[in-house]
Amino acid sequence: MSRQLLPVLLLLLLRASCPWGQEQGARSPSEEPPEEEIPKEDGILVLSRHTLGLALREHPALLVEFYAPWCGHCQALAPEYSKAAAVLAAESMVVTLAKVDGPAQRELAEEFGVTEYPTLKFFRNGNRTHPEEYTGPRDAEGIAEWLRRRVGPSAMRLEDEAAAQALIGGRDLVVIGFFQDLQDEDVATFLALAQDALDMTFGLTDRPRLFQQFGLTKDTVVLFKKFDEGRADFPVDEELGLDLGDLSRFLVTHSMRLVTEFNSQTSAKIFAARILNHLLLFVNQTLAAHRELLAGFGEAAPRFRGQVLFVVVDVAADNEHVLQYFGLKAEAAPTLRLVNLETTKKYAPVDGGPVTAASITAFCHAVLNGQVKPYLLSQEIPPDWDQRPVKTLVGKNFEQVAFDETKNVFVKFYAPWCTHCKEMAPAWEALAEKYQDHEDIIIAELDATANELDAFAVHGFPTLKYFPAGPGRKVIEYKSTRDLETFSKFLDNGGVLPTEEPPEEPAAPFPEPPANSTMGSKEEL
């Protein structure tokens, strides 16, 4: 009898030793709960860590926005994102839009390396490990077009002249790839570029008759446009093949008008053009005499295509920020300025004569050949610049004061709008008062938005630099805590701090022209 009971007793002991709730069929704490039905808001799937897997299985093309409820950029994107979903649904496109609350779904945010909001990722065919980063615009049509070119063909297949002419006639910018073999790897390069060049429409053909009708004998990418020259050809190198970077630069350069007016609609494309030299003609377009200058400006432009971008700035429009950047008043128009975006150096005509095609051409050649010195912005020296504890420096007196070999000069480079600068202002004033009786120490400040220096450029605010007495034009950048005690310790130690001092405080970046990315600003975590 005891032998018969032994297996039963062993079974009871095993059950008793299991953790509570681990009976057969129970779920361990580490297991995922069963997948839920995925809710929707305004046509957008609302995902969690429990439903992402289901969404990936059910939707072969899935764009997911990682957002934060407090993020202003996310709030601005939300209505456009919903509109894009509605547009694509109306077209019966096989693509789905979804969103994830990043702070609430921290595991997902960490899994996909989300460090700023909004971040959008595109998943294909359920592949969870290698999503594509979204790099397109933030408006509804831009989002929709970015997705169309990924779930559908990025270029239209053209079989005859009627189809080609219909495509060319229907858009301002049309790019057609003429390839004798559509299986060639150059075609894959062409289609890859077509996915992201959303401001152009792309076509593709291998028809010999179309080669003949457009005067081509070998593989060529042709840009058709309804302005300027009307057409620009990019022959494919028979030995090296089609280079994505070279083709991209060609299309960006030749898709720009020879003369572009600066405004809110064109500014992003101007800065994304990858042409470093920009020649700006400042005119008042309400005046007939100024408008007459545009013809000569346009006449000079073709010979500098790809080297210099010709831009018209209307001083009668909302362009005060452009005038300020060049240190100009509206009354200075008509006038020319050239800026190199890489070095930020600015140039002005030396003679200041009339603006003609000849004078514009000569000015451009002189700058490109290094025959014109750049000019630096500077405010006028205030009469009382040295009367307060904090001395006021401008471009015109900076060198004389900062590199005085008999003085130790501590300078704050600031921007009037900078919050960090305003927060540290009381400490800087207190520092100046503390050391105002030290004849060999000067505490100063310089508005770096209105004054430029030949010695170095300022890239963030506030930037603090110490210029010790003595020869050699030595410069020490201060990167520690911005308070009176630490400032004083720094000065008393001759421009050095003990190693235990806390790390540097952040600086607000100097405003830059819009970058090539079309996603715009994001908010970091």
From Swiss-Prot:
It is found in: Endoplasmic reticulum lumen. The keyword Hydrolase does not apply. Keywords: Chaperone, Disulfide bond, Endoplasmic reticulum, Glycoprotein, Isomerase, Lipid-binding, Redox-active center, Repeat, Signal, Steroid-binding. Changing residue 284 to Q: Increases formation of a highly stable disulfide-bonded PDIA2 dimer. Transmembrane segments: none annotated. SUPFAM superfamilies: Thioredoxin-like. The keyword Kinase does not apply. The record marks 72-73, 419-420 as: Contributes to redox potential value. A motif (Prevents secretion from ER) lies at residues 522-525. Highly expressed in pancreas (at protein level). Changing residue 364 to A: No effect on interchain disulfide bridge formation. The record marks 482 as: Lowers pKa of C-terminal Cys of second active site. Disulfide bonds join 71-74, 418-421. NCBIfam families: ER_PDI_fam. Acts as an intracellular estrogen-binding protein. May be involved in modulating cellular levels and biological functions of estrogens in the pancreas. May act as a chaperone that inhibits aggregation of misfolded proteins. This is Protein disulfide-isomerase A2. It comes from Homo sapiens.
